[in-house]
């Protein structure tokens, strides 16, 4: 009974209660992604690892999943999440680890790590820095590909 209740709670939180009896092969990419998140939530673990949890989702579902993840974290679950969307990272992460070629180039509080300089040196993309009016946090807006070889290093940000 405990496992069934955990599955029902997780399916409800992820908005997939109506999909519990649908074969996985019949689900869209976005539905499948939300079902996978529900499966993760049903485990009720103290640490949750997520790899691109908003892939295949439309903007409304992306935000609802990110809000759900924030609520999960607020309730005491540690969440480690891989995300490539800089706006999502800036808005939802407390701490960031930036990697390039499998190596950590920066880590720390989001406000310290998420800069146009970091994006330029890590992803070779020029950005403008904006301020999110709802959180007050800075976030980069990509504007062009930075063609020259990387000239600096971010090793000092660790």
Q: Positions of the model-derived regions?
A:
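Catalytic Walker B motif of ABC-type/P-loop ATPase nucleotide-binding domains
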Residues: 48-52
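Helical segment within the ABC ATPase nucleotide-binding domain
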Residues: 62-75
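Conserved ABC ATPase signature
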Residues: 23-27
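Hydrophobic anchor residue at the start of the ABC signature
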Residues: 37-38
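Conserved ABC ATPase "signature" region
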Residues: 2-19, 44
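ABC ATPase nucleotide-binding domains
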Residues: 120-158
